[in-house]
Amino acid sequence: MNNRRNVSLQCLQTALKLMPTHFAFRLALSIFMAVLPLLGMSMSRSIYSYVEASSNSPQVLSALVFPLSMYAIYLILTKAYTVYYQRVAVQFGAILTFEKKIKLLLHKKTGEIDMRFYEDPSFYNSLWEAKVASTNIYRVAECLIEFISISVSILVLSSYAASIKPLFFVFIFLTAMPSLSEQVCEGILRSKRQKELAIVAKEERTRWEHITNIESAKERIVFGNYPLLKAKWLHTTNQFQEIEFALDRKLLKLSACFALIRLIAIAGIYVSASWFYYIGNIDYADFITTISVALFLQAQYGELFEVIGYYSEFTTLVKPYFKFMEIKSDFPSEIACDAGTIQLKNVEFSYPTSSENVLQNIDLLIHPGDKIAIVGVNGAGKSTLAKILSGLLHPTAGVASGLQSRYTRVMLQDFQCYALTKDENIALSEIHPKDPSLIRSLSELLDIADIPSGEILGREFGHRDISGGQWQKIAMARLFYHQGSVLILDEPTSAIDPLYEKRLNEIILQQATPDTTLIVISHRLSISKLLNYVYVMDNGRIIEEGRHSDLLQSPNSVYRQLWEAQTSWYK
């Protein structure tokens, strides 16, 4: 119970933080609409009293004007509230606005989470569940407002019914029990279904993207795997529908059972009211009003328990959002270090999906302005070390210092190719490029000036497609455009032809000023001889280090073996 109360408070705090005016106005309006039926009932009672009195003796017609006018106002206000606020303002305005704002909070949170979490596949399930659960915050807030307004309405109208005949209050209350039982059972079933559907829904969406997205169109054509992908999607879709249909069948049986009980309870109201009217304890107006109040309250009780059921469901469904928002990064302790110096000491790293360390006992000391290369065969741990040095990942053991992401610019091996123009790809994070002249000079320097600046890149159907080498140059231009005191390049020439590789290496050194720390990670050694110092990695360890010329002097060094193997290609 306390847990559900805490979730409710979190939902209210979030809702009021994002849309305070909306929810305050919504509460005030709901309470007003909760009291409004009292006006309708009292006016209808006056009208029926007038009709009954008219059957016995002539009545002044003007006495009917006021109750009819007020009853008309009641009907107009009720209809206007239903049509405008519930169907227009809420469904097509407030909910959409709230969803946009809550997604921005999620996006902000994903930018604050340690990158190590992104290496765990289960993290993406948590992120997906949080995204789906986030809209339930609005629903929880709405349920609480509805609960307050319906409770006020029931209290007011029950008091009104009791003023006619106290016994009616007891009968009306008894009609609420079937609705209560139905909503509790339905809420339990819906919560169970939502939990079962969460993973299936994600899988179904992924399967659908496999057979519809443009990126995989080529492989669908080349390998002819469309029938397989379609069969996988249909299987998941059928599984999704079976879970939904199973719940619908159970709900139908429950509804039929409780509808019968509810019918018996309503019949009891009619019989008791008819008996009191027959023996003369109430007049015709009281009889009709009692029946109207009973039917209205019976519907109100149904709505109340429906809201309670939805509240129970939504407070359960919303938990993944708050669980995701409470994720905290465990940052390693730092050691004292000179300004601008990067130091790793006994650093180890393992991905959440593996028990083995990808990096082991890494010791590095990089001073401001150092130009170093980190080389090794594929799978040596170079890219993981690059992410450690850039601050994207944090060591699982050991200490690190000087990893200031604000001043570090990184060109990752798996850099992003955005469906934007060339200029937008380079000046990424700037809505309007602040330095168009720098973009032009970098484009000329990297031989990508011939790519039109105004065309969307990266889509084969309808937009301009460019080669992998051109994309790599754009990623490098992005790095140089944003500048920084530390430049990290992970496999910067992997898609570049050998004829241009030498020129690109010279450009990299040219862009790194004497005060700039340059770290190049590569399994191609053409650039390592141009840098001051070389670290050689294998199986997650630094096995050799030194200057290029010194490492070549050692006949058994791994670096020399790599160098000779690569240079032999061109002999």
Predicted regions and their residues:
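Membrane-integrated ABC transporters
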Residues: 1-37, 57-67, 90, 120-155, ...
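An intracellular "coupling" helix at the cytosolic face of ABC transporter transmembrane type-1 domains
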Residues: 17, 129-140, 192-199, 209-212, ...
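ABC-fold ATPase nucleotide-binding domain signature/coupling loops
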Residues: 127, 418, 445-474, 569-570
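Cytosolic ends of transmembrane helices, especially the final helix of ABC transmembrane type-1 domains
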Residues: 225, 269, 288-327
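Helix-to-loop junction immediately C-terminal to a conserved catalytic motif
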Residues: 390
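Transmembrane helix-loop-helix hairpins at lipid-water interfaces of multipass membrane proteins
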Residues: 23-84, 147, 151, 157-190, ...
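C-terminal portion of ABC ATPase nucleotide-binding domains
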Residues: 514, 524, 529-571
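Cytoplasmic coupling helices
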Residues: 88-104, 108, 171-215, 231, ...
